[in-house]
Amino acid sequence: MELRFPRFSQGLAQDPTTRRIWFGIATAHDFESHDDITEERLYQNIFASHFGQLAIIFLWTSGNLFHVAWQGNFESWIQDPLHVRPIAHAIWDPHFGQPAVEAFTRGGAAGPVNIAYSGVYQWWYTIGLRTNEDLYTGALFLLFLSTLSLIGGWLHLQPKWKPSLSWFKNAESRLNHHLSGLFGVSSLAWTGHLVHVAIPASRGEYVRWNNFLDVLPYPQGLGPLLTGQWNLYAQNPDSSNHLFGTTQGAGTAILTLLGGFHPQTQSLWLTDIAHHHLAIAFIFLIAGHMYRTNFGIGHSIKDLLEAHTPPGGRLGRGHKGLYNTINNSIHFQLGLALASLGVITSLVAQHMYSLPSYAFIAQDFTTQAALYTHHQYIAGFIMTGAFAHGAIFFIRDYNPEQNEDNVLARMLDHKEAIISHLSWASLFLGFHTLGLYVHNDVMLAFGTPEKQILIEPIFAQWIQSAHGKTTYGFDILLSSTSGPAFNAGRTLWLPGWLNAVNENSNSLFLTIGPGDFLVHHAIALGLHTTTLILVKGALDARGSKLMPDKKDFGYSFPCDGPGRGGTCDISAWDAFYLAVFWMLNTIGWVTFYWHWKHITLWQGNVSQFNESSTYLMGWLRDYLWLNSSQLINGYNPFGMNSLSVWAWMFLFGHLVWATGFMFLISWRGYWQELIETLAWAHERTPLANLIRWRDKPVALSIVQARLVGLAHFSVGYIFTYAAFLIASTSGKFG
């Protein structure tokens, strides 16, 4: 028989309908379900695909460097980072008329270009790159790494180089190598780069391979390190009037604890950053020697887990059985990795704007907005994925005998209590927050704004005060100049930090009021409800009171026929599917809040946010409508401007989003009938009937149509907001 797609599933390959194609694509990466798969081959395939992933990442970053070097304006941007607009790449579009060519010719370019809102210019400048040649060199190096990764992936699929199953299951060795090798050594190497290349560059000294060994990064070299006088490395830091990239006001320190921001660049001190990375390297290099391998020293993770029995005996057998459960389940490991990565990505979003580490990026408002929004959305998708694979673990890999009465089993035993508590918290947050917003709306509508219910976030203000913010007059801990906490840190690091916290031009500890109180609770509602849906999906994945045998149906199933009182929409997949909508809406509130708060801060009219954010009409009118006006007017009978492309994307995003509903709110039979009518017409139309297809066309399954709908909803939603965000910010601030 001829080989048909998909080769990994003979059952699907013989399917006579178009289901073969769609199910083939859907299960292409579900290696576990493929014909003739063994546990060893599964691990080897995944391992090899990691190299492919790395190759793609290196190729992509290489492309960024290459296009900026070729078509960008890096060298002229460096001369004046605050006023020259950084160019991402040129645009060649045969549809452009003269007005379009003029509108998109910016940043000193000769023709139409795209502006970079990714922050790469600021990053490359901060780490010591200065010329187009530097960028080309970086691009070539990354291209080399990409090729190396591809070769590595291919090599590890060859019989001689395939790692064995025992190698993959050796958790202690992997942890040691990842902690020491991946995090420790790379952090140490990055500290080295900052000290040897980036910090000298920030002081006007150009260090490259040709003079790398001649230029001492510190006047006394390794002397202070070897004699134990480490504090010398912190002496004579850059002064507050230091001009970044020049010798003016430059010091000689390489590892400092200044705190706060460089006055000119509004970013963290490079010497503080180097110090931070050195500390991280130190911690991880030690951490990478903790676990017992073939040397017989260090901890055995299994022993650690088995020894952890909760006190009092009332919480079961603690972590017994967890080692084998985690080590033998790829889905459990992936779930843990995704949960960690999701949290880290969200933390990156929060820290990139509040503690900016790249020179001048804090004054590039559109880039700040784009990076915050980008990282929050990425975090949302990664976190929902963590719960998806947690649910798949419970269905495919969980063994009740191995986990008797341990924490996993007890989570399942207590799932009703967990789910109902989450439900109660979500209901409480939702009704109270909405109640306050709607009450305030009504008061404004009736012309009595003074009757709004406005709650000051006193606990959050108290926390900000404890960290040194004096605005609220709490006089506590670091905001109390006479207290022991304040005096203890004074010589060490406090002056820079306290100045930064109380300087109202940055995003560190923004002043908060009733509008912030309300939107924080709206976001808390979104987070708790998303979590409720995801946790319920995972805890009910194996079975529920309604459907005790759910695990036998797999991760995703539409229904189990008409019986049992209705078993549709209760697969773990359905929970994930619903949670993604909540995740997107929650991040919508998060990004609306962040963006509006910052727009008013940057424009110097914070009172607009403070006054309008306490009722829903304020959000709709003074944030969404007011800031989309330029977009809605992007191209009109009087010509076009550089926002036109965003106006088009705004419309296009709405279109994609709305298309999602066609798949989400429909029934399979309708499509099947429509498809058969279209196929009938096709077969009876001259010329068209010369083209035949081998597979009988059938409608998508219910689950597939939901996936397609969800994809359109998500992509359209994000496209629409991206266009709104970039256009409304760049339209105001350039």
UniProtKB/Swiss-Prot annotation:
E.C. no: 1.97.1.12
Gene Ontology molecular-function annotations: 4 iron, 4 sulfur cluster binding; chlorophyll binding; electron transfer activity; magnesium ion binding; oxidoreductase activity
Entry binding sites for chlorophyll a B1: 654
Protein's UniProt name: Photosystem I P700 chlorophyll a apoprotein A2
Gene that encodes it: psaB
Localisation: Plastid, Chloroplast thylakoid membrane
Main location: plastid
Gene3D superfamilies in UniProt: Photosystem I PsaA/PsaB (1.20.1130.10)
Protein's organism: Oryza nivara
Cross-referenced PROSITE patterns: PHOTOSYSTEM_I_PSAAB
Record-listed [4Fe-4S] cluster binding positions: 559, 568
Binding residues annotated for chlorophyll a B3, in chain numbering: 662, 670
Binding residues for phylloquinone: 671
Coiled-coil region(s): none
